[in-house]
Regions:
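Active-site loop ensemble at the mouth of alpha/beta enzyme cores that anchors a bound cofactor
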Residues: 24-36, 138-155
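Hydrophobic alpha-helical positions that pack around
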Residues: 1-101, 113
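Ferredoxin-type iron-sulfur electron-transfer modules in oxidoreductases and energy-metabolism complexes
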Residues: 2, 143-265
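Short amphipathic, charge-patterned alpha-helical segments
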Residues: 101-117
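Short glycine/threonine-rich loop-to-helix capping motif typified by GTGT followed
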Residues: 17-20, 100, 131-142, 203, ...
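Terminal amphipathic helices with adjacent charged low-complexity linkers/tails
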Residues: 4, 117-151, 247
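Extended, hydrophobic alpha-helical segments in both membrane/secreted and soluble proteins
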Residues: 105-108, 121, 185, 199
Length: 265
């Protein structure tokens, strides 16, 4: 027997980070802690604390009732079991789907989610939520599991599969993602607090046809000074769409520079 208490959070994205979540539960400001000590050693109210996502807890009854071997028989050799995939974006049937790990991403997009809407074609997809690198359409046959997605250059993340069709300019998509992380930054770490704003301002100028070609290099330089330099991965999350969009869709950026009058450069 055990007691379950639920607490309604204020909706801050940063509180998805485990130590920021602990601060919030204690009534403090939602911002990450220095680690170590890790929560399993010193967590909620300085007590050892185990933190799990709801999806992890949901598979426990199946494993207890059916056995670990039956659960491990699902999926790939290294990625066992199933994954809840939240498909959004330019698909005919957005929604939540449970798939066996290793299912081809193409099958999720075209069979389960009904394919690309409005007769358009797939341009890109973000496999595991906005914090994971976007991939071009030619990677759509990759298996939806941790190892295969990593080999393709991204991460499975939260399983939030975002589908982008060919009506979209990737620079605009990138700006929207940067805007989200700029808003959700708790401001504790300088690289994140300042870096997200710099990225937003530069990409915005590019979209306003006020940028210069070297702005692309400047974006990559700023990203290099943000990644792995903060208390939590929010800065890395903001860097992800910028770096991956430049890598796979540099031409979308360069298209804006063709519109700039020579006298304005």
């Amino acid at each position: 027997n055990l007691d379950i208490h639920t607490h309604l959070g204020a909706g801050a994205y940063i509180c998805g980070e485990e130590s920021a979540l602990l601060n919030s539960l204690e009534g403090g400001r939602g911002e990450p802690r220095m680690k170590p000590p890790f929560p399993a050693v010193e967590g909620l109210y300085a007590k050892p604390t185990v933190i799990n996502n709801v999806e992890t807890l949901c598979v426990v009854p199946y494993i207890v009732n059916e056995g670990a071997e039956k659960y491990a028989a699902l999926g790939t050799e290294k990625s066992k079991g199933t994954k809840l995939v939240s498909v959004s974006g330019h698909v005919k049937k957005p929604g939540n789907y449970e798939v066996v790990l290793g299912t081809p991403t193409r099958e999720i997009i075209y069979d389960l989610a009904g394919g690309i809407r409005d007769g358009n074609k797939l341009k890109a997809f973000i496999p595991g939520g906005s914090s994971t690198p976007m991939l071009p359409a030619d990677k759509v046959d990759v298996g939806y599991d941790y190892e295969a997605i990593a080999e393709a250059g991204s991460m499975l993340g939260s399983g939030a599969l975002i589908v982008i069709d060919d009506s979209v300019n990737i620079v605009e998509t990138t700006l929207r993602l940067i805007s989200f992380y700029m808003h959700e930054s708790c401001g504790k770490c300088t690289p994140c607090r300042e870096g997200t704003r710099w990225l937003y301002q530069i990409v915005e100028r590019i979209m306003q046809n006020k940028g210069q070609l070297e702005y692309i290099d400047k974006l990559e330089d700023i990203c290099g000074n943000m990644a792995m330099k903060t208390f939590c991965p929010l800065a890395d999350a903001c860097v992800s769409p910028v770096v991956s969009s430049i890598k796979h869709f540099r031409s979308d950026y360069e298209e804006y520079f063709k519109k700039i009058p020579v006298s304005s450069v």
